[in-house]
Structure formats: structure tokens, C-alpha cells
Amino acid sequence: TKGPEIRTGDQHMKLITGTQVRVVSDPELKDERHLFVDYPHLTEQLGQGNHILLDSGLVKLEILENHGDSLACRVLDGGTITPKRHVNLPGISVKLPGITLSDRKDLEFALEENVDVVALSFLRNRDTVLEVREMFRERGEQIKLIAKIENQEGVDNLEEIIQVTDGIMVARGDLGIEIDMEELPQIQRKIAYLCAKYGKRLIVATQMLESMMENPVPTRAEITDIANAVFEQSDAIML
């Protein structure tokens, strides 16, 4: 599943470091100086000091002031925003359903194709897992469920999620955007410990052997990363 996603609109905008931009959640307000983000609770939940990360964290904005219908932001890390870029709101518990309409269609497809495993993205608590299990149970299926831990709320509710899933994926890409990067190793180790405690599968993902897309041999750092995953009793790594 894709899980609860937030994205920019159809705009193409160049954001220069040090300049200011207004961010809006009303598509009627978007223009060359107002960037649209498709999250209706944007101005309700965010304010001065919060950050907005765009395009998988490549562009970073700091909120200076909440104007009610828009957020005045300073561009900390600039870049060019193309249509439908991913948006992260670190530290914010987003008010979106755990399973979207698109996810339900994908889950129906999974049932029709008799898949063995489904990975659930951006899990925040156990409720979404139980909802999907019930959906499968009503159809007489027992498809394995893997929880992707990708945000702070998922980390906070880690133990309750592990208890109701068949395994955990440490999705270090989005997780490393949503939380401080230096916390990643500790969180990965905690997840490994809890998976061992409850006898659940562990998958470590993101940037494993990424250099081999261009080079014939991995870097020493990648070898060490894989070795650490093995030492943590991972059942699989995802390239």
C-alpha cells in the first residue's frame, strides 16, 4: 500500500535558498509565489518553527508565520519542485486515514492475485493492521502483513504494531526524513530487538548496495551496513 501521502500540486517552482515562499492548502490560492500542498489541515496543525520537507527531503522549508490561509516559509535548502512531489511534515501526526481508497483497490488486487505478503506503508498504530487483517479474514484469506516503519508515530507505537504484524520493514528512506538522521541506527537496533523478542520477521531496507547501480563492487560502508543487518538477525535486506 501507499499509505497516507501528502504531495504538492501540478506546479513547477524554483525555490532559492534564503528566499521566502507561501505554502497553501487551498488550490484556488496557488500561483507563482504560493506553493500548493494537498493537505487540508496544513495551517491548522503547523506554525512557526515547524519544517516542511519537499521532494523526499531534498528541499527544506522553515515556517516563519501562520497567516491562517497560508504559511510564510523561509527556504533553508533550495531546489526545483516539479509536479506531485512528496511532502513530509516531521513531528506532525497527520490527520489522514491509515488506508486510503487507492490502498483498498490495491488490497483487492492483492486478494485477486493470491499474493503471499502485503507491505503496509506509513503505519502509525496497530489499528490499520487490524483493519486490513479483518478485510482479508472476511474473504477467507490470511495474507502475511509487513509493517513499514516510516515516521515518528510508527516509532512511538512500535511495540503494539509488532505484536499484530508478521514482520517489520525498517524503511530507512522516509524514516530518515521524518526523524533526525542520527537517530536511525538506534531505532533500527530497537526494531531488531523487538522483532527477536516477539519472533517476527525483520527486513532492513533502503540504500543497500546502492553504489552497485554504477559500480561492480560495493563500498566498504555498504558491506559493513549489510553485516550489521546480519548481526541484528535480519531475515532479509531490500536493495
Give the residues covered by each predicted segment:
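Non-catalytic helical/linker scaffolds that mediate oligomerization, partner binding
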Residues: 1-239
